[in-house]
């Protein structure tokens, strides 16, 4: 499965966590101390609402458990791992001058420095866990950053983990019938990723 994901495959894993663990993680995320920020965080704006406004917090409590579940699923050892909780307030998205509609910023995810000389940074594997049932929410995947219509669209379903290469262009999808969008993103590197 790792080769499939690293070759731009997208895999879905329904009921990834046992219900009790899923509810505990959801409760943890709702009680985190989030930092008001924006994406892309490397750019400078007059204020955060001029970009893609969001709230973020690193999540640590269940990382050993999540990492172990992923290793069992993928049949490989994870060598680097981080989990990031992200909350999006849809009223803030509405006032952003970026004129977001259904899709947020089309982007690629976190990269890591390769150990091979003269080889460009490579994408980590990304995982997205949803905490709401939103047919119009979820994640859209694109062939390139300039596209306005996604090639693949995956709706948000609670406790469904979506795994993909961080090198695929993608964007969050917004369901404006909700006030907030809460997700847990995992970024990791496995053995053999040099």
What are these regions (language model features)?
Residues 1-95, 99-103:
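Non-heme Fe(II)/2-oxoglutarate
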Residues 86-194:
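Catalytic core of non-heme Fe(II) oxygenases with the double-stranded beta-helix
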């Amino acid at each position: 499965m790792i080769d499939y994901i690293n070759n731009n495959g997208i895999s879905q894993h329904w009921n990834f966590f046992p219900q009790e663990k899923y509810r505990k993680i959801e409760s943890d995320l709702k009680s985190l101390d989030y930092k008001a920020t924006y994406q892309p965080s490397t750019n400078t704006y007059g204020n955060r609402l001029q970009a893609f406004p969001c709230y973020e917090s690193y999540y640590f409590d269940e990382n050993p458990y999540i990492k172990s579940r992923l290793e069992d699923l993928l049949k490989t050892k994870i060598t680097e791992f981080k989990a990031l909780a992200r909350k999006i307030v849809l009223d803030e998205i509405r006032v952003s001058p970026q004129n977001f509609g259904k899709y947020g910023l089309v982007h690629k995810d976190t990269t890591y420095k390769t150990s091979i000389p003269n080889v460009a940074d490579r994408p980590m594997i990304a995982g997205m866990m949803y905490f709401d049932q939103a047919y119009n929410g979820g994640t859209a995947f694109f062939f390139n950053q300039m596209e306005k219509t996604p090639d693949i669209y995956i709706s948000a379903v609670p406790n469904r983990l979506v795994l993909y290469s961080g090198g695929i262009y993608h964007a969050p999808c917004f369901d404006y019938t909700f006030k907030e969008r809460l997700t847990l993103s995992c970024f990791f590197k496995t053995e053999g990723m040099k």
